Amino acid sequence: MSKELIVSKIENGTVIDHIPAGRALMVLRVLGITGREGLRIALVMNVDSRKLGKKDIVKIEGRELTPEEVNIISAVAPTATINIVKNFEVIKKFKVSPPEVIRGRFKCRNPMCITNAPREPVVPTFYLVKREPPLFVCAYCGRYHELSDLI
Ligand code: CTP
């Protein structure tokens, strides 16, 4: 028997599904979405999931997120599936994976790193060195960071 949807389907946009239960707000924060952009967003938290037991879902109307934009959420939602919806149909589906390179979003945790020096026009850059669990290295000072350290 099909159960009723808690939130209706969207016409165009992105559905982030299979988020670990309770992490939907963190996902929005990591994506830098505050709600003040005027996008129509639906959050569903702690609903039943066959794969995860319980899960969260985020539906963003009118914005198609790219893998580059969403891969960063793998730090807080490694199980997430991204669904791109057009005319009510899922036209693309992919799983998040740690990004190969992160530029300009996070600060290096090494206070002596050149990227933390005042008035240095250096963009913090981190390269993925290991996938499981994800480990990044600062391109400037060589300090290793887990994704959760950066966020
Ligand atoms: N969805 C939506 N609006 C649409 C189409 C899909 O909000 N127009 C949502 C569904 O509610 C679901 C997710 O997008 O949360 C994925 O949809 P779909 O691929 O149809 O579902 P499943 O086959 O169950 O997905 P999966 O195999 O990834 O579990």
From Swiss-Prot:
Binds 1 zinc ion per subunit. The keyword Transmembrane helix does not apply. The keyword Coiled coil does not apply. Keywords: Metal-binding, Pyrimidine biosynthesis, Zinc. Belongs to the PyrI family. Contains catalytic and regulatory chains. This is Aspartate carbamoyltransferase regulatory chain. The gene is pyrI.
